UniProtKB/Swiss-Prot annotation:
Protein name, as recorded: Probable ATP-dependent RNA helicase pitchoune
Function text: Probable RNA-dependent helicase. Functions in cell growth and proliferation. May have a role in ribosome biogenesis and, consequently, in protein biosynthesis.
Bias kind Basic and acidic residues: ranges: 670-680
Catalytic reaction annotation: ATP + H2O = ADP + phosphate + H(+)
Species for this entry: Drosophila melanogaster (Fruit fly)
Gene3D superfamilies: P-loop containing nucleotide triphosphate hydrolases
Gene: pit
Length: 680
């Protein structure tokens, strides 16, 4: 029997008892006066009623009389009182009473605790003494109905809350959690704080113990705190923010009609797909909706799915801003949590302006999480903009001696420019049965080496930013599922990607800075108890970079390499490039892009383009005479527009309009009406 029914039964018994006592008193008076008894018609006493501080609303009294019509209740004079302020909108007024009364009695008490920020006077504690209740002739206060954190459908139009409705807020139901680094790091210790459906999914994924970043961040995140997390690559940051996101949506009972409650921003398409894959496994036993939007996908299909309602959304920055500005059916006003993964990478690739616009468009009352492998001044500035409350900082490896994981064996070899390709070919030929990733500095360099190695019977695959999205996706999953293989890639694959069992990371072209080096080598030795190897090729003039790596806590040893065992294919390479027109054109573009990328290095005192021997560099691309490179053209192409607003190609046309007046005539933006007139 529920609390409400118990209170009603007490009320009925008390009133029947009062009626009997009243009839006995009248009978005694009639016997003394020897007058015939009068029919009182079951009228209640005219004793003035006392008005309780905690009153019952008129609509709830009507519900009580409908449920218990067989027990006649005395008519009471209702006194109008202003309704209590409530910060939560009740969902679906059409079925609010029927659905609530059919739920289990055991869930009644726990559900009352899960209601967020209801005024204290609206809920009766039920702890008043029975004697005090019998002495006072007043209505018993009925506990407030269970309310759901859903928009009021009767007061909303087109899925948008009415103006009079206050935005619903989140009060964590995990008040019993204490922020502490518990010795028990098993996921089973989260029982009671995390739903059974989530724990079952984690177990099916094969995880039993939490990593350090997970054990330190899960408790405050489950309590609704803002957090800035810094940990090494492969330390389990993805689950650290996905578990609280899923639990938040589950606690609030989000439905598709409520729109998007959690947004997760990732820097690249591959990382977005990987995060979405982990989320899919974690949501195996939940009924909430989840989706992925990213550049290269069909925007119209994404917009239609957003209109139907996606509770947890994984997105890249540019496409997310496009939907926020141009998809009218995208309901994000009920957003409860914003998660930004690999923040430093997002800022490095030029999406700082997009992030600021996204943060300004989203609701201010939300939980925010920022995760990255490194912390910089730009991240701190973004944290002040995105995090309104005092965030918790969790730096897992701040006090460690090394910035890379323990199972990683890393080193370098000093190689002159003309021998670089021969060393790489020999190394890949020897390790072709292992899983190897090779990093280049430009897309054209990846494209050329991919064509060259496959032409000379060394099977390799490639991922770079100029590929179509379908090709990138197919290659990524093929390499993930393969037991061995060679992947040539740019830094698009250097952040966050969890590719299993990578044996070697080869950095053919030097990274921009130590942070980029850390992210590249983080693709191997991921997880506890795993091992991996990393190799960095350096010119003799670049040895000063080791000082920066040492300052960044990156231990590097020089690897021994037998120069007598290098495959001497230089003559065959030069003949092939001279005869094959397509390889020749690809090699020219790769050479130019390599020199331009070298010129754009941040550490110019180490990577100085003036120290490059272009004749020796050209030999590594198969040329006897180096092609002409215009560094000014490269610099102009590397410039980004001052401000990317997202959608409509604004940044593209703004860049094209810079220059002569003739160009402005050709690339001037026009609206739809002007475009129609022009077409006529």
């Amino acid at each position: 029997m529920s609390i409400r029914e118990k209170l009603l039964m007490k009320k009925i018994v008390k009133r029947e008892k009062m009626k009997k006592e009243l009839s006995q008193k009248k009978g005694n008076k009639n016997a003394q006066k020897q007058e015939p008894p009068k029919q009182n018609g079951n009228k209640p006493s005219k004793k003035p009623e006392k008005l309780s501080k905690k009153h019952v609303a008129k609509d709830e009294d009507d519900d009580l009389e409908e449920d218990f019509q067989e027990a006649p209740l005395p008519k009471k004079k209702q006194q109008k009182q202003p309704p209590k302020k409530q910060q939560i909108q009740v969902a679906n007024s059409d079925s609010e009473s029927d659905d609530d009364e059919q739920e289990d009695e055991a869930d009644e008490d726990s559900d009352l605790d899960e209601v967020a920020e209801v005024d204290e006077e609206d809920v009766d504690s039920g702890s008043e003494d029975d004697d005090q209740q019998e002495d006072e002739d007043e209505e018993e206060p009925v506990p407030a109905k269970k309310t759901k954190l859903l928009p009021n459908k009767s007061k909303a139009q087109n899925g948008k809350p009415a103006k009079d409705d206050e935005p619903f807020t989140v009060e964590s139901s995990l008040a019993a959690l204490d922020y502490r680094d518990s010795d028990d790091r098993s996921f089973a210790s989260l029982k009671g704080a995390v739903s059974e459906a989530t724990l079952r999914a984690i177990k099916e994924m094969g995880f039993t113990e939490m990593t350090e970043i997970q054990s330190k961040s899960l408790t405050p995140l489950l309590k609704g705190r803002d957090l800035v997390g810094a940990a090494q690559t492969g330390s389990g940051k993805t689950l650290a923010f996905l578990i609280p996101a899923v639990e938040l949506i589950n606690k609030l009972r989000f439905m598709p009609r409520n729109g998007t409650g959690v947004i997760i921003i990732s820097p690249t398409r591959e990382l977005s797909m990987q995060t979405f894959g982990v989320l899919k496994e974690l949501m195996a036993h939940h009924h909430h909706t989840y989706g992925l939007v990213m550049g290269g996908s069909n925007r119209q299909v994404e917009s239609e799915k957003l209109g139907k309602g996606i509770n947890i959304l994984v997105a890249t920055p540019g496409r997310l801003l496009d939907h926020l500005q141009n998809s009218p059916d995208f309901l994000y006003k009920n957003l409860q949590c914003l998660i930004i993964d690999e923040v430093d990478r997002i800022l490095e690739i030029g999406f700082e302006e997009e992030l600021k616009q996204i943060i300004n468009l989203l609701p201010k009352r939300r939980q925010t999480m920022l995760f990255s492998a490194t912390q910089t001044a730009r991240i701190e500035a973004l944290s002040k903009l995105a995090l309104k409350s005092e965030p918790i900082y969790v730096g897992v490896h701040d006090n460690q001696d090394t910035a890379t994981v323990d199972g990683l064996e890393q080193g370098y070899i000093v190689c002159p420019s003309e021998k670089r390709l021969l060393v790489l070919f020999t190394f890949l030929k020897k390790n072709r049965k292992k899983k190897v990733m090779v990093f280049f500095s430009s897309c054209m360099s990846v494209k050329y080496h991919h064509e060259l190695f496959n032409y000379i019977d060394l099977p390799v695959t490639s991922i770079h930013g100029k590929q179509k999205q379908t090709k990138r996706t197919t290659t990524f999953f093929q390499f993930c599922n393969a037991e061995s293989g060679i992947l040539l890639c740019t830094d698009v694959a250097a952040r966050g990607l969890d590719i299993p069992q990578v044996d070697w990371i080869v950095q053919y072209d030097p990274p921009d800075d130590p942070r980029e080096y850390i992210h590249r080598v983080g693709r191997t030795a991921r997880g506890s108890g795993t091992s991996g190897h990393a190799l960095l090729l350096m010119r003799p003039e670049e040895l000063g970079f080791l000082r920066y790596l040492k300052a960044a806590k990156v231990p590097l040893n020089e690897f021994e390499f037998s120069w007598q065992k290098i495959a001497d294919i230089q003559l065959q390479l030069e003949k092939l490039i001279a005869k094959n027109y397509f390889l020749n054109q690809s090699a020219k573009e790769a050479f130019k892009s390599y020199v331009r990328a070298y010129d754009s290095h941040q550490l110019k005192q180490i990577f100085n383009v003036n120290t490059l021997d272009l004749q020796a560099v050209a030999k590594s691309f198969g040329f006897l005479v180096p092609p002409v490179v215009d560094l000014k053209v490269g610099a102009a192409k590397r410039e980004r527009p001052e401000k990317r607003v997202g959608g409509g190609g604004f940044g593209f046309y703004k860049k094209m309009n810079e220059g002569s007046a003739s160009k402005q005539r050709h690339f001037k933006q026009v609206n739809r009406d002007q475009a129609k007139k022009f077409m006529r």
